[in-house]
């Protein structure tokens, strides 16, 4: 079967077609980074309007890339939440409309389940059970995963997500939006140990995170030490090391608590090379395995939605023709497949 996936939850328009026998047949992506750069962050109204302009042309491009026509599509999956309500409504409206016109099922997909399942698109997909670290601009969560829809939240950020903290700290360092990848690049030139940032909430039991204090610590460090290039790089290094160490410490605890031997890392921040290297080293010492998607599937994309839609469709999930989205949607509320 072939599923068309539509992703419009924030500032990327992603369209993909997934075949359960042949794999990914098409993958189209348009990023709105340049549109929002002057504002230092995503402007919801601008994001929604740009999705309106880009979604249908990208669907046409995906069909052309795959060599398919509408008659070859067996289902349409779309991100129904969580995300920006206006952006979600664009994808949901287009998805439901196409499903009606093509007389195929419409499948609402949870955005974070899409991220969680993105490593399944790789040649060496993880087997259940595993601990999942979902780490992005909007979420930082540790989840026990024993099957599709069998998700137990172990811990999450009580304030800023890790990706949000990266972007905010990057802005303090004078970097453009989105600053997370630029901060990591700057950190590679930094001197380890010149500055030492705290590892929030690692001195107490539990698996929750807190990253807002690191931004404040960075602001104070910048104020007290100036902004020459090397100092900025050293601060970036200290910040990144603190975030990576914190995530690693919490992952260790989650693995100890569950007894699982596999760790899956997903979401935009999972593309961070330092984080990947540290977690790979940690899992090697534990004689376990770590899995993640290729970098282009770490950030928002249509491929993960098409794949998650296929999984949910096979489990019997479909929707009526009403258009509804859930800007806030806990992952634990999803039914088991």
From Swiss-Prot:
Belongs to the KAE1 / TsaD family. HAMAP family: TsaD. Binds 1 Fe(2+) ion per subunit. Disruption phenotype: Appears essential for growth, since no null mutants can be obtained. Conditional depletion of this gene prevents t(6)A37 modification, and leads to pleiotropic phenotypes including increased or reduced cell size, unusual distribution of DNA around the cell periphery, nucleoid loss, and membrane/cell envelope defects. These phenotypes could be indirect effects of severe translation defects. The TsaD depletion phenotype is suppressed by overexpressing the response regulator RstA. One of its GO terms (molecular function) is glycosylation-dependent protein binding. Can be proteolytically processed in vitro by TsaB. NCBIfam families: gcp_kae1, T6A_TsaD_YgjD. Substrate binds at residues 134-138, 167, 180, 272. Homodimer. Interacts with TsaB; may form a heterodimer with TsaB. Also interacts with TsaC. Required for the formation of a threonylcarbamoyl group on adenosine at position 37 (t(6)A37) in tRNAs that read codons beginning with adenine. Is probably involved in the transfer of the threonylcarbamoyl moiety of threonylcarbamoyl-AMP (TC-AMP) to the N6 group of A37, together with TsaE and TsaB. TsaD likely plays a direct catalytic role in this reaction. May also be involved in the metabolism of glycated proteins, but does not show sialoglycoprotease activity against glycophorin A. The keyword Cytoplasm applies. This is tRNA N6-adenosine threonylcarbamoyltransferase. PROSITE patterns: GLYCOPROTEASE (PS01016). Its main location: cytoplasm. Pfam families: TsaD. Keywords: Acyltransferase, Cytoplasm, Iron, Metal-binding, Transferase, tRNA processing.
């Amino acid at each position: 079967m072939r599923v068309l996936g539509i992703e419009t939850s924030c500032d990327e328009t992603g369209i993909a077609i997934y075949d359960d026998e042949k794999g990914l047949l098409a993958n189209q992506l348009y990023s709105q980074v340049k549109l929002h750069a002057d504002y230092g962050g995503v402007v919801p109204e601008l994001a929604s309007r740009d999705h309106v302009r880009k979604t249908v042309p990208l669907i046409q491009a995906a069909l052309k890339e795959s060599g398919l026509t509408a008659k070859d599509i067996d289902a349409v999956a779309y991100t129904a939440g969580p995300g920006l309500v206006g952006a979600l409504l664009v994808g949901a409206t287009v998805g439901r409309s196409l499903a009606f016109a093509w007389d195929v099922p419409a499948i609402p997909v949870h955005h974070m389940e899409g991220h969680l399942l993105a490593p399944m698109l790789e040649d060496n997909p993880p087997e259940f059970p595993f601990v999942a670290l979902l780490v992005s601009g909007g979420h930082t969560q540790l989840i026990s995963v024993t099957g599709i829809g069998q998700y137990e939240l172990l811990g999450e950020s009580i304030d800023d997500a890790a990706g949000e903290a990266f972007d905010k700290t990057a802005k303090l360092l004078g970097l453009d939006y989105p600053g997370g990848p630029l901060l990591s690049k700057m950190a590679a030139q930094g001197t380890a140990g010149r500055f030492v940032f705290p590892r929030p909430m690692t001195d107490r039991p539990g698996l929750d995170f807190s990253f807002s204090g690191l931004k404040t610590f960075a602001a104070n460090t910048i104020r007290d030490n100036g902004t020459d290039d090397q100092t900025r790089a050293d601060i970036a290094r200290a910040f990144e090391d603190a975030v990576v160490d914190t995530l690693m410490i919490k992952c260790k605890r989650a693995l100890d608590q569950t007894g699982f031997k596999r760790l899956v890392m997903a979401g935009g921040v999972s593309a961070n090379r330092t984080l990947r290297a540290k977690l790979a080293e940690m899992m090697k010492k534990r004689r376990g395995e770590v899995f993640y998607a290729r970098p282009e599937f770490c950030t928002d994309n249509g491929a993960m939605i098409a794949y998650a839609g296929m999984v949910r469709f096979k489990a019997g999930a479909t929707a009526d023709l009403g258009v509804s989205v859930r800007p806030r949607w806990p992952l634990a509320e999803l039914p088991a497949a």
